[in-house]
A protein has these predicted regions:
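Aromatic-residue-lined binding/catalytic grooves and analogous aromatic/hydrophobic interfacial grooves
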Residues: 372, 378, 434-435, 447
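Intrinsically disordered, low-complexity regions of eukaryotic proteins
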Residues: 10, 14-18, 22-23, 317, ...
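Extended repeat-based solenoid scaffolds, especially LRR ectodomains
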Residues: 441-442
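Extracellular/periplasmic, surface-exposed regions of secreted and cell-surface proteins
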Residues: 1, 5-8, 32-89, 102-418, ...
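A subset of solvent-exposed loop/turn segments in beta-rich extracellular surface proteins, enriched
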Residues: 13-41, 93-104
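A penicillin-recognizing enzyme superfamily signal
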Residues: 438
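Extracytoplasmic gating/loop element in the C-terminal half of outer-membrane beta-barrel translocons
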Residues: 212, 433, 445-451
Length: 453
């Protein structure tokens, strides 16, 4: 069968090649016209397309009380996550397709992935609280350690020969392996102080110092101790429960009113593992030889993103606690944004990770809940909420006005004065409901099977 006709000279057509034979007369066919029924029949099996994920989690929380006011606690957890995945595109039902990374057409492919991540966390905390008449004080302090290791192994190969041997081996065309072996850790010291007076005025102050193996050793910000840089993150919150004032007792419809405000500084340490490391990667030369080429140049100045934030809030209960209203507003400014930055062509690389740019966020949310019916055995509540959040890029590195990034075949733009990570698409003008409308617009199909010549 070829070009829509049956020929006697195509006696060697097999299940795996019939689509290639059928499309042999077309120079620009759409390889996405694979047979979905054949893909399900020949591509589904535990040794073909299969995904398995398992997790083991252990946690202990011992606590020792010295007396009624002083205690020492520990939170230790261990998490093991394993992922095993097989991916297979069958020969039968799928025509040859173009693999851009190889610059050539291939019949089918087989892939496998196995990953393992170990995560250990330890949080040791000392707590003290005391009340002096109308004054209540609580102090907490401790240190938190986190250690992670991640191993990833991947394999890929093309042209298995038939769908009965979907196994990956060195005999496959363009067979390749990859993977990573990452280990990182972080350490944080923190203190927190809470104070309230007669349940009316509340104050909270926090301070944390944190360092991570992912940070560079020569960051612009932070305090250097023990040979590494530490980020310092303070915070302060205050609130007033107005309904606990004696002069508010006469307002029967208002059961609870709390006003709060605060400021804090936080950091984002989600740095790529290799951002501060220079490393080599294997490279194939025309399929004839393999070697090592420099794949990344570490940036020892890279650091955490820093966000400074203010917030205000109102909590109220009214009408004998049958109606609750919550309102929160925040505004934040983030600097040292983590992003790709261009490198000199002399380095042999296009980009590397760095800090640059600034971003503003602001928004609010409102929530209302109401008790429609309440009885000792049954309660009915309804609620509604609405929120609005908006961000704007205020600066980019190297004096740039905008930056374009290619992600999964799409272009994402980050531009000063506009929201981060913009992407655009076509707007649909409508759907043709009849063939006459499509013909009037000059649209048609060349062949009955929809193949474009």
């Amino acid at each position: 069968f070829s070009g829509g006709k049956i020929y006697e000279n195509h006696l060697d057509v097999t299940d795996e090649t019939y689509l290639d034979e059928a499309l042999a007369g077309y120079s620009n066919y759409n390889w996405k016209l694979g047979n979905p029924l054949a893909i399900l029949e020949y591509g589904e099996a535990q040794n073909k397309n299969h995904f398995e994920n398992s997790m083991l989690s252990l946690s202990i929380k011992p606590k020792f009380k010295f007396n009624d006011h002083l205690s020492l606690s520990e939170h230790f957890s261990y998490v093991l996550t394993n992922t095993n995945e097989k991916y297979y595109i069958p020969l039968n039902g799928v025509p040859d397709y173009y693999v851009s990374s190889l610059g050539a057409f291939r019949q089918n492919e087989a892939r496998s992935l196995f990953s393992k991540q170990n995560s250990i966390m330890s949080d040791t905390r000392l707590e003290w609280d005391q009340r002096y008449a109308a004054h209540a004080i609580a102090l907490r302090g401790g240190f938190r350690m986190q250690w992670d290791s991640y191993q990833l192994n991947t394999q890929v190969g093309y042209n298995t020969g038939n769908d009965k041997t979907p196994f990956i081996s060195s005999s496959l065309l363009d067979a390749a392996t990859g993977g990573t072996n990452d280990q990182w850790n972080s350490l944080a010291y923190y203190v927190q102080a809470d104070y309230n007076f007669k349940g009316r005025y509340y104050l909270q102050a926090t301070m944390a110092a944190e360092s991570s193996s992912r940070f560079g050793r020569d960051t612009d910000q932070g305090v250097k101790m023990c040979g590494v840089k530490w980020g310092i993150f303070p915070g302060f919150q205050a609130s007033w429960v107005a309904t606990n004032e004696s002069w508010m007792a006469g307002l029967g419809f208002l059961n609870y009113l709390r006003l709060s405000a605060g400021v804090d500084v936080s950091g984002n340490d989600d740095l790529p593992y290799y951002a501060t490391r220079s490393y080599f990667a294997s490279s194939d030369y025309m399929g004839l030889a393999s070697g090592l080429t420099i794949a990344g140049i570490g940036n020892e100045k890279i650091q955490w993103e820093r966000t400074r934030r203010i917030n205000i809030g109102v909590d109220a209960n009214l009408l004998n606690n049958r109606l609750g209203v919550r309102f929160n507003y925040f505004r934040s400014a983030t600097d040292h944004l983590l992003m790709w930055q261009e490198m000199s062509y002399l380095s042999g690389l296009d980009k590397t990770w760095g800090n640059g740019g600034k971003l503003e966020n602001r928004g609010f949310d409102v929530e209302a809940t109401g008790v429609v019916w309440a009885s000792p055995s049954w309660q009915w509540q309804v609620g509604a909420s609405v929120g609005h959040y908006k961000n704007k890029v205020t600066a980019l590195p190297d004096g740039q006005r905008y930056m374009d990034t290619e992600i999964l075949g799409a272009t994402v733009r980050t531009e000063i004065g506009r929201p981060a990570n913009l992407f655009y698409g076509y707007k649909a003008q409508g759907v043709f409901s009849t063939s006459a409308e499509a013909q009037a617009a000059g649209l048609y199909i060349h062949d009955d099977n929809g193949v474009d010549r």
